[in-house]
Curated annotation (Swiss-Prot):
Domain LIM zinc-binding per the UniProt entry, residue ranges: 239-297, 298-357, 358-416
Subcellular localization, as worded in the UniProt entry: Cytoplasm, Cytoskeleton; Cytoplasm, Myofibril, Sarcomere, Z line
Name assigned to this protein: PDZ and LIM domain protein 7
Domain PDZ: 1-85
Oligomeric and partner information: Interacts with various PKC isoforms through the LIM zinc-binding domains. Interacts with TPM2. Interacts with TBX4 and TBX5.
PANTHER family per the UniProt record, alphabetical: PDZ AND LIM DOMAIN PROTEIN 7 (PTHR24214:SF0), PDZ AND LIM DOMAIN PROTEIN ZASP (PTHR24214)
InterPro entries assigned: PDZ (IPR001478), PDZ-LIM_domain (IPR050604), PDZ_sf (IPR036034), Znf_LIM (IPR001781)
GO BP of this protein: actin cytoskeleton organization; cell differentiation; heart development; muscle structure development; negative regulation of DNA-binding transcription factor activity; nucleocytoplasmic transport; ossification; regulation of protein localization
Comment, domains: The LIM zinc-binding 2 (LIM 2) interacts with TBX4. The LIM zinc-binding 3 (LIM 3) domain provides the structural basis for recognition of tyrosine-containing tight turn structures. This domain is necessary and sufficient for interaction with TBX5.
Main location: cytoplasm
Record-linked PROSITE patterns: LIM_DOMAIN_1 (PS00478), LIM_DOMAIN_2 (PS50023), PDZ (PS50106)
A GO term, aspect molecular function: metal ion binding
Keyword field: Cytoplasm, Cytoskeleton, Developmental protein, Differentiation, LIM domain, Metal-binding, Osteogenesis, Repeat, Zinc
Organism of origin: Gallus gallus
Length: 416
């Protein structure tokens, strides 16, 4: 790993923003640079990993610990970094199978800033194609408003039934298992990841996964969905129907390791024959997809109706996608970042328009913890309130104004 060291002379700001940390399960890295700032002039690049801060390793630091360590440096900051392009060529480990959500350790900074959890205490893995999310935690802008994670979106869709096999003398064949897809971390394959997922945002990354062709054995999960397989009678062996315990003459179904007459393999509620279209098994009972959704599907926190399509997990509750909307523009939030203000969710655009505060000098947001001042009817970072001509810092000093621009005593009557 090629690393380099930079020495920045104070005072702050240093001209960069961080993302990641131990509490995000992501390496600490540079997410944004201020054009012409101290870090940019020193050759620091967006996406570069921060290995050491003043000689102290960042491997065990949380995001807040890293920020506090930088603040404690005073007028001189020494950083050891690794170039971003070095990480792109490294082989990444395969992602987790789609039936298990990725494991992350989240340490929320406020009582409300917590990740949404999947519905139910022991929700069964979804064996069909679905979407897996990777939430990113956010540090709140101000005590009055707390951004939230919007969880995950999943799309249940029962798989079609297996093909009919009626030629005599052929044993039923099981499709070969398809290996699960592999993926690489988004910060390694997407050059724009650092900009889109800066620390002042909350969002989720969605990855499409395919279900292996062979269903997972029943003992490994409490609820499964699969298709009953039809097969002819094997020579020299007479199967018995698992339901009626009678000898099967002719075609039969193989499901859950048992044999059935085709007309006796039915949904336990609506009695629909399940030789095609797939089925669910829950605690020994067999359901068609429709009855399973009706009985076990979660309820929407807004309209209180059952959710049988896309499920939105947010604020520790489940929602229809069309029910969880921005309080201002009424647009479904889906997997985008959102912020909470007075108990109502807002999309990022409307929140910035209605509640956001920007520095008059640099036009960047004033984040929580940033030093700022109010002057000339605007908000300024403490380091951005300077003379419009000579750039002398005017914090705590006498100043003059012309066309809403601050001027020092020496340039009070200069043309702006």
């Amino acid at each position: 790993m090629e690393s380099y060291k930079v020495m920045l002379n104070g005072p702050a700001p240093w001209g960069f923003r961080l993302q990641g940390g131990k509490d995000f399960s992501m390496p600490l890295s540079i997410s944004r640079l201020t054009p012409g700032g101290k870090a940019a002039q020193a050759g620091v690049g967006v996406g570069d990993w921060v290995l050491y801060i003043d000689g102290e390793s960042t491997g065990t630091m949380t995001h807040i610990e890293a920020q506090n360590r930088i603040r404690a440096c005073g007028d001189r900051l020494c950083l050891t970094l690794s170039r971003a392009q070095n990480h792109l060529g490294k082989p990444q480990k395969d992602s987790l199978p789609c039936s298990e959500p990725p494991k992350y350790n989240f340490a929320p900074s406020t009582a409300l800033n917590k990740t949404a959890r999947p519905f139910g205490a022991s929700s069964p893995p979804n064996p069909r194609p679905g979407l897996v999310t990777k939430p990113v935690t956010y540090v709140p802008l101000a005590p009055a408003c707390t951004p939230q994670h919007n969880g995950q979106v999943s799309v249940p869709d029962p798989s079609p039934g297996a093909a009919m096999k009626t030629e005599p003398g052929l044993a039923p064949r099981t499709p070969a298992a398809t290996p699960g897809p592999t993926s690489r971390p988004p910060w390694a394959v997407d050059p724009s990841f650092a900009e889109r997922y800066a620390p002042d945002k909350t969002s989720t990354v969605l990855s499409k996964h395919s279900q292996p062709a062979t269903p997972t054995p029943m003992q490994n999960r409490s609820s499964i969905v699969q298709a009953a397989q039809q097969a002819p009678e094997s020579p020299g062996r007479t199967p018995l129907c698992y339901k009626c315990n009678k000898i099967i003459r002719g075609r039969y179904l193989v499901a859950l390791g048992h044999y059935y007459h085709p007309e006796e393999f039915t949904c336990c509620q609506c009695r629909k024959v399940l030789d095609e279209g797939g089925f669910f098994e829950e605690k020994g009972s067999i359901f068609c997809p429709k009855c399973y959704d009706t009985r076990y599907a979660p309820s929407c926190a807004k309209c209180k109706k059952k959710i049988t399509g896309e499920v939105m997990h947010a604020l520790k509750m489940t929602w229809h996608v069309q029910c969880f909307t921005c309080a201002a523009c009424k647009t479904p939030i889906r997997n985008r970042a959102f912020y909470m203000e007075e108990g109502q969710p807002y999309c990022e655009r409307d929140y910035e328009k209605m509640f956001g505060t920007k520095c008059r000098g640099c036009d960047f947001k004033i984040d929580a913890g940033d030093r700022f001042l109010e002057a000339l009817g605007f908000s300024w970072h403490d380091t951005c309130f300077v003379c419009a001509i000579c750039q002398t810092n005017l914090e705590g000093k006498t100043f003059y104004s012309k066309k809403d621009k601050p001027l020092c005593k020496s340039h009070a009557f200069s043309h702006v």
